Amino acid sequence: MALKMDKSKELFEEAKKYLVGGVNSPVRYFKPYPFFVEKAKDCYLFDVDGNCYIDYCLAYGPMVLGHANDAVIKAVKEQLELGSAYGCPTEKEIILAKEVVKRVPCAEMVRFVNSGTEATMSAIRLARGVTGRKKIIKFDGAYHGAHDYVLVKSGSGALTHGHPNSPGIPEETTKNTILIPFNDEDAVKKAINENKDEIACIIVEPIMGNVGCILPKEGYLEFLREITEENDILLIFDEVITGFRLAKGGAQEYFGVVPDIATLGKILGGGFPIGAIVGRRELMEQFSPLGAIYQAGTFNGNPISITAGIATLKQLDDRFYKETARTAKILADTLRELADKHNIKAKVYNIASMFQIYFNDKEVVNYEIAKQSDTEKFMKYFWRLLEKGVFVPPSQFECCFTSIKHDDEVVDKTIKAMEDVFEGLE
């Protein structure tokens, strides 16, 4: 049964007159037009046409507690009464920083910024400034934000819409960015051997959540840690997605691999804009005002985002991680079983509360294989799920997430929808 989306269509036509492409981020667009949200609560989105969707996109990751969490709203309302921006330090910045340091293994000091993009840009600047080297290694398909250093062979919306290399970025900017396949130890060794004493850092998503959900091969992250230490190269974990999601201390706690620097975002802001660079004290103290490496921002440490972050992290206990991982595994297992039952070529990957399906008969271990997935079949799967009241990201090059509000009743409804969708998907 087709969705009623008349009001969304009308709003999209109006939006196109004033907003580029009718949206403010490419990942929000899908053909023929996206639904427009009126409100959200727990694990549900409600659109302007009165449709209700179980949400597995969760704003592309941040809403681990579900939407409109009572404790977060209460804390933010109280802070709003006290002011929304000061341009001065606050005690709450210290409180959240201490919580981050307590949880994240590599974090001895913190610098709050406003987005994951800002965090990775500043982390790379820090690595270059500390080492005095220019070159960086990034992995094909990894998305580390929308800045020029790393927007080459990118994932996320850049891959979804067919522009992994953005025009407008001079070759001079990216000539020091070395691109190699994920999960390939030999490629890392070759890149380092060919650029001896020139590489400042390797930046990596421990889970490639912007090309779907590509997992590191066993021992791969440990290998990156060892080879960077051997060659005096800094290792940066981009944990904008995995931070506080895989475990209290993120991927570095989950895998037991501690980088030199990490970037955080999404969950850290409890639904409000935020980012953070964290790392060893001797590295972090090279940022201004203590050091010469400049990093600043009008809204760094914004009290609204900081308050929401404190209220969010307080609720991420052991039960949270156990439950969100349990429900994600159930859904991933269901997708595998349905693909097998209906003889559909598909691979499903899951870790903690992250999962995704690729319509592909090969094991998806890197960007090149992910690109070979059947996007037409995925969009058929996406629309059929949407018609059944289940919203997943509109691209298999994004990741699905569970929140603490995805309880057994919600999961059962989702499984029923998935079963219906796979009938005739061949």
UniProtKB/Swiss-Prot annotation:
Please tell me where this protein is predominantly located. Answer: cytoplasm
Task: Write down the Pfam families for this protein, in alphabetical order.
Answer: Aminotran_3
- Catalysed transformations (reactions): (S)-4-amino-5-oxopentanoate = 5-aminolevulinate
Q: Which UniProt keywords apply?
A: Cytoplasm, Isomerase, Porphyrin biosynthesis, Pyridoxal phosphate
Q: Which GO terms describe its molecular function?
A: glutamate-1-semialdehyde 2,1-aminomutase activity; pyridoxal phosphate binding; transaminase activity
Needed co-factor(s): pyridoxal 5'-phosphate
Signal peptide feature range? none
Biological processes, Gene Ontology terms: protoporphyrinogen IX biosynthetic process
Q: Which CDD domains match?
A: OAT_like
Indicate yes or no for the key word Kinase: no
Pathway this chain belongs to: Porphyrin-containing compound metabolism; protoporphyrin-IX biosynthesis; 5-aminolevulinate from L-glutamyl-tRNA(Glu): step 2/2
Where would you find this protein in the cell?
Cytoplasm
The catalytic activity of this protein is classed by the Enzyme Commission as: 5.4.3.8
Of the GO CC terms on this record, one is:
cytoplasm
Post-translational modification N6-(pyridoxal phosphate)lysine, affected residues: 266
Q: Which family does it belong to?
A: Belongs to the class-III pyridoxal-phosphate-dependent aminotransferase family. HemL subfamily.
This protein's name: Glutamate-1-semialdehyde 2,1-aminomutase
According to its UniProt entry, this protein's organism is Methanocaldococcus jannaschii (strain ATCC 43067 / DSM 2661 / JAL-1 / JCM 10045 / NBRC 100440)
